[in-house]
Design a protein with these regions (language model features):
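A glycine-rich beta-to-alpha transition motif near the start of alpha/beta enzyme domains, typified by
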Residues: 69-96
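Conserved beta-alpha-beta core of the PfkB/ribokinase-like small-molecule kinase fold
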Residues: 144-213, 230-232
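Hydrophobic anchor at the start of a short beta-strand
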Residues: 9, 68-71, 94, 169, ...
Length: 245
């Protein structure tokens, strides 16, 4: 990718509404361990906050704060209008978002108590469907695609298209790892610009692919590993660099 040129950024992943509810007590006070086989509990909450979430939505918003204008590639449900208004307000392109009119947008329903314990229900909704973006107008030499957790069919297909077009792409498997098979994961990583994961996910990737870190660096050019309060580690075939938190 030429230095100094404007780079077109494509972010594929999920779009979701996060509906967060606050429970004033402790959830555990209302669950009887010896009666768990007939669990039937209602928690009355103090209120609900709705936030715009999903991997693609969150990453695109962060990039917009850096004055970038990424294209979001994802599916969204029939309740899309509020999310679209928010994306447009934040200068985020919606041309790559496919509306699934028979489904609701993916949604997380989260109850958090005063001890920060959580119970979450997640409806994948529109995320069950591939977005089917074809990158027809993408300038492969001045574009980059970040493939974040979302519809698995999309994740596999977008890596294939990027390779076919000669476009750099970044792999961020995250919470999608439980859906992958080792062979498919190796093929997905092969030819990528970057692999981004935390240290636990990296160990899982090495186990699933039956490869060590050196082997993975034969598939992807660079590995970025987040280490929580210890910062991040950037690795390629020549060096490791630690970035403080």
């Amino acid at each position: 990718m030429p230095c100094g040129d404007t780079v077109n950024i494509y972010i594929s992943g999920s779009m979701a509404y996060d509906r967060i509810m606050d429970f004033p007590g402790k959830l555990s006070d209302h669950i009887l361990p010896d009666k768990i086989h007939i669990l039937n509990v209602c928690f009355t909450v103090n209120g609900m906050v709705e936030k715009f979430g999903g991997t693609a939505g969150n990453i695109a918003y962060t990039l917009s704060l850096l004055n970038e204008r990424p294209v979001v590639i994802a599916t969204i449900g029939k309740d899309y209008e509020t999310y679209f208004d928010w994306l447009k307000k934040n200068n985020i392109l919606t041309e790559g978002i496919k509306i699934i009119r028979e489904e609701f947008t993916a949604g997380a329903y989260i109850i958090t108590d005063k001890a920060d314990n959580q119970i979450t229900g997640f409806n994948p909704g529109a995320m069950k469907y591939p977005s089917g973006y074809m990158f027809h107008d993408a300038d492969s030499k001045n574009s980059i695609s970040l493939i974040a957790p979302g519809n698995l069919q999309d994740m596999v297909e977008y890596a294939r298209i990027c390779k076919e077009k000669g476009m750099d792409y970044i792999c961020d498997p995250g919470q999608s790892l439980t859906q992958w098979e080792g062979k498919t994961l190796r093929e997905w990583l092969d030819g990528s610009l970057l692999l981004i994961s935390n240290d636990y996910e990296l160990e899982l990737i090495m186990k699933m692919t039956d490869m060590d870190k050196k082997g993975l660096l034969g598939l992807t050019r660079t590995i970025i590993t987040t280490l929580g309060e210890k910062g991040s580690l950037i690795s390629n075939s020549e060096f490791d660099v630690t970035i403080p938190a």
